[in-house]
A protein has these predicted regions:
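Cap/lid segment of the alpha/beta-hydrolase catalytic domain
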Residues: 35-110, 158-159, 437-438, 498
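Accessory cap/linker subdomain of secreted extracellular hydrolases
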Residues: 60-61, 69, 132-231
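Glycine-rich nucleophile elbow surrounding the catalytic serine of serine-hydrolase chemistry
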Residues: 122-132
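Alpha/beta-hydrolase fold nucleophile elbow
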Residues: 112-124
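C-terminal, loop-rich substrate-recognition/catalytic regions characterized by aromatic stacking residues
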Residues: 278-643, 648-664
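Conserved alpha/beta-hydrolase "acid-adjacent" motif
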Residues: 245-250
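Short beta-strand/loop motif that positions the catalytic acidic residue
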Residues: 232, 238-240
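N-terminal cap/lid segment of alpha/beta-hydrolase-fold proteins
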Residues: 2-36, 400, 404-406
C-alpha cells in the first residue's frame, strides 16, 4: 500500500495492487477502519472503469469514507484496462471482467483486515457488474446494491430498445474510448507514459460490435441476469430513478425474486439518489449503511424488515428542461405483480374506450415525431427532460380517453397488443403514453419502440413475417404514475422517433387494425411510507475537491438549413479540482443530428466527447468523435480518436467501417 492518509476513524490508501491469476494487476483505493487490523471487518467494493484517481473521485469521497467511518472496509477498484489498472478492455461485460470481479472477492477475503464477509455495489456499469457477480455468487458475497443498473443488456441498456438502435449507443461509442484512452496516473510506475502508449496502441472501438449485433442473440444475453435470475444467490437492493430508463430493472427483479430483492425507485435520473435531479433525493449513504449493517455485521441475519418496494408515485408536472422537485409521493408495497389487476382500454376511432372495435387507421408517414423526446432516452441529464409532447402528438396517431372521472394509478409495466398490416418488414412503431392536462399540455409518462422485423422476444424469426396481418405485443417500461381526475390518458403511435431512435430504411404504410392497451392498477390505495427514507446529507463534511462548473445542458433549437432539419445539444465544460492530488479533471460533450424531411437514408448523428486532465506533471487531453450514417443495407460508421500530452499528439486512431444492416 502507498500514499497512506490517516484520520481518527480510518486510514486511506491511494493506490493498492490486486493480483489477477494471469499476472495482470488491478488498481484499488482503500479506506480502512482504524481498528481493522486488530478487529477484522467486512469489506464492500465498487468495481467500475471510471478512474479512481480523478474521474469519479468526488463521488467516491461521498460514499467510501462514510463506510470506513462506520466500521466497514471500503474499496474502489478500476476494471482491467481502465484508470490505473493494467491489461486491456476489449468490450463491456466480457467474461474476463466478470472473472476479475470474483478474483477481487477472493483477494478481499484473504486480507488480514477482512473478516471474510463481502458486499458489492455500484451505479450503472458498477451496479450491473454487481448483479453479474451475484449469479452463482461465491459464499463470501453476502449482499449487493445495484443502482441504475440493467438486468437486460439488449432491451434496457443504452444500445437498443424494442429491437431498434438507439442513438444513445453512438454517444456511448464516442465516450467509452475516451475513458479507456485516458492516461494512468503516476501512482503506478515511473514508466506510466510507456504503459499509456501501449494501451493506446490497442485501444478498442466497441461500437462496431454493438452495431453488428442487431437482435437479442448470444452477445446481448451474456451478462443479462434477467436470463439467470434463478441463479442469483445474495440479497439485492435495487435502486433506480424514473427519469432514467435503467429503472426498469427494479420492479422486474423484485417481481422475479421477491425472496431476494428489495427495490427503491425515486424521481431522479442516472445518479446516486443523494445527488437527485429531479428530486426529492434520498440519503444514500445512510441507506446503504443500514443495508450493510444488516447483511454484513449481524452474525445470522434474518429477513430484512423493509418494504419490498418503495417508489415515488409521480403525478403531473408542467414540462420543463429541468425540474428541481417532482410532484408525487412515496409509497411502500409488496412486489407490484402481487397487488395489481389489469385494466383494458381498446383502441377505437373515437380514442381509448372499454369496447373492442375495428379501427383500420393508417399511421402518419413522416419523420416529425421525436423532436420533443428529450436530450437522451436514458440518463435524464440535468436540463434534458422531455418537453411538451404536443408537437410530437400532432405528428402521430393518437388515442385518448375521455377526461378521467377519478384518478388512475398505473403501477408496473403496461402492455399493448396490436394487429396491423405493414408494407415493409423493417418498419418500426413508437408508442408513447402521455398525461394530457385540461389546458392541452402533454407530458410523456413513458414510451416504447418496436422493430417489426423481430419477433416478440426480439429475436430474428426463422422466416420473415408475412406482410399481411401481423400481431405484436409490446411491454412498456415499469412505472408508478398517477393521472389525475380531469386529465386524459393518451396513447400516441408513430413510425419513427428521430433523433432518439435510428430511423428505418424507409417510411412505409402501417395500418392499425385492432389494439388493446392493458394497464396495471393496484387493488387498493397504496400505503404511504411508515418510515421515511434517510434525508440527503452534504457529504463529505470536509471536501478535498472544488467543483468549478456544473452547467445545465443546452439544447440547440431545431433549424432547417441546406435542405436538412438540424438539432442537437451541448453539455458545457464541467470541471473539478482535487487539492489532495493537485489535479483538474474536466469534460464536455456535444451532439448533432441531421436529416432531410422524410428521407430516412439521409439520417446522420455525430457526437464528440472530450476529457482534460491537468496534473502536476503535465496536461492530457483525449477526444473521440463518432459519426453514423446509413444506406439501405449498411451502417456507415466513422470514428476518430486523439490523445495528447502537453499539446503534443501521443496517438490518433481512425475507424471507417461499413457494417451490415439487416433488421434495424
Amino acid at each position: 500500500m502507498n500514499k497512506e492518509k490517516e484520520i481518527e476513524s480510518f486510514r486511506s490508501f491511494e493506490h493498492v495492487w490486486i493480483d489477477m491469476p494471469d499476472g495482470v494487476r488491478l488498481a484499488a483505493r482503500i479506506w480502512l477502519p482504524s481498528n481493522a487490523l486488530t478487529k477484522p471487518a467486512p469489506a464492500v467494493f465498487e468495481y467500475i472503469p471510471y478512474r479512481k484517481v480523478d474521474m469519479v473521485r468526488a463521488r467516491d469521497e461521498r460514499n467510501h469514507p462514510y463506510l470506513a467511518e462506520n466500521g466497514i472496509v471500503a474499496v474502489r477498484v478500476d476494471m482491467r484496462g481502465s484508470g490505473d489498472s493494467e491489461g486491456l478492455m476489449s468490450d463491456m461485460y466480457c467474461e474476463e471482467e466478470i472473472d476479475d470481479a470474483r478474483q477481487v472477492i477472493k483477494w478481499l477475503t484473504c486480507q488480514p483486515w477482512c473478516n471474510g464477509k463481502i458486499g458489492m455495489f455500484g451505479i450503472s456499469w458498477g451496479g450491473t457488474a454487481s448483479l453479474q457477480a451475484n449469479v452463482n455468487a461465491p459464499d463470501a458475497l453476502k449482499a449487493i446494491i445495484a443502482v441504475c443498473a440493467t438486468h437486460d443488456r439488449y432491451e434496457d441498456d443504452i444500445h437498443h430498445m424494442g429491437g431498434c438502435l438507439l442513438t444513445d449507443s453512438v454517444e456511448w461509442g464516442a465516450t467509452l474510448p475516451a475513458i479507456l484512452g485516458a492516461p494512468p496516473s503516476a501512482n503506478i510506475e515511473e514508466n506510466w507514459f510507456e504503459i499509456w502508449k501501449a494501451r493506446l496502441d490497442k485501444l478498442s472501438f466497441p461500437l462496431e460490435t454493438w452495431l453488428r449485433n442487431e437482435d437479442r442473440g448470444s452477445y446481448w444475453r451474456h451478462g443479462s441476469v434477467i436470463h439467470q435470475s434463478d441463479e442469483m444467490r445474495a440479497p439485492i437492493l435495487c435502486v433506480g430513478g424514473w427519469s432514467d430508463r435503467y429503472s426498469n430493472s427494479v420492479m422486474s427483479l423484485v417481481d422475479r425474486r421477491p425472496d431476494l430483492a428489495w427495490g427503491i425507485v425515486g424521481p431522479w435520473g442516472h445518479h446516486y439518489p443523494d445527488h437527485a435531479h429531479p428530486g426529492p433525493g434520498v440519503g444514500f449513504q445512510k441507506l446503504m449503511l443500514e443495508w450493510w449493517q444488516h447483511w454484513l455485521i449481524k452474525d445470522n441475519p434474518l429477513e430484512l424488515e423493509w418494504p419490498k418496494l418503495r417508489t415515488w408515485v409521480r403525478s403531473y408536472d408542467s414540462p420543463a428542461d429541468a425540474i428541481n422537485i417532482r410532484s408525487g409521493s412515496w409509497v411502500q408495497t409488496p412486489a407490484s405483480k402481487e397487488i395489481t389487476f389489469m385494466t383494458k382500454w381498446h383502441l377505437s376511432k373515437g380514442g381509448l374506450n372499454k369496447d373492442a372495435s375495428e379501427i383500420h387507421l393508417n399511421l402518419p408517414s413522416n419523420l416529425k415525431a421525436g423532436t420533443k423526446g428529450a436530450d437522451t432516452g436514458y440518463f435524464g441529464r440535468f436540463g434534458g427532460l422531455p418537453p411538451d409532447q404536443s408537437n410530437d402528438d400532432r405528428a402521430s396517431l393518437c388515442f385518448d380517453t375521455k377526461p378521467l372521472e377519478k384518478d388512475c394509478l398505473i403501477y408496473g409495466a403496461a402492455r399493448l397488443e396490436l394487429s396491423l398490416k405493414s408494407s415493409d418488414h423493417r418498419n418500426q412503431l413508437c408508442l408513447r403514453l402521455n398525461d394530457v392536462a385540461p389546458d392541452g399540455t402533454s407530458v410523456r409518462i413513458t414510451w416504447a419502440i418496436r422493430n417489426l422485423a423481430l419477433d416478440d422476444n426480439l429475436e430474428t424469426p426463422d422466416q420473415p413475417f408475412p406482410l399481411g396481418d401481423l400481431k405484436i405485443r409490446v411491454q412498456f417500461p415499469s412505472m408508478a404514475y398517477r393521472i389525475k381526475a380531469g386529465h386524459i390518458l393518451r396513447l400516441a403511435v408513430s413510425q419513427s422517433y428521430w433523433p432518439m431512435v435510428w430511423v428505418p430504411p424507409s417510411i412505409g404504410v402501417i395500418t392499425l387494425l385492432r389494439g388493446v392497451l392493458t394497464l396495471p392498477e393496484p387493488h387498493y390505495e397504496l400505503e404511504s411510507l411508515k418510515v421515511n427514507l434517510p434525508k440527503v446529507e452534504d457529504l463529505p463534511l470536509e471536501k478535498s475537491y472544488t467543483v468549478s462548473t456544473e452547467a445545465q445542458l443546452e439544447r440547440y433549437p431545431e433549424k432547417f438549413e441546406n435542405g436538412e432539419i438540424r438539432s442537437g445539444w451541448y453539455q458545457p465544460y464541467s470541471s473539478v479540482y482535487f487539492n489532495e492530488i493537485d489535479t483538474y479533471f474536466g469534460y464536455e460533450t456535444c451532439a448533432e443530428f441531421r436529416i432531410r424531411p422524410n428521407e430516412t437514408l439521409t439520417a446522420c448523428c455525430c457526437y464528440e466527447h472530450s476529457m482534460t486532465f491537468i496534473r502536476p506533471d503535465g496536461t492530457a487531453v483525449v477526444t473521440c468523435m463518432v459519426q453514423l450514417k446509413c444506406n439501405n443495407d449498411k451502417y456507415l460508421l466513422l470514428g476518430t480518436f486523439k490523445a495528447s500530452w502537453d499539446n503534443q499528439i501521443v496517438k490518433t486512431h481512425k475507424w471507417n467501417l461499413n457494417i451490415t444492416r439487416k433488421y434495424t
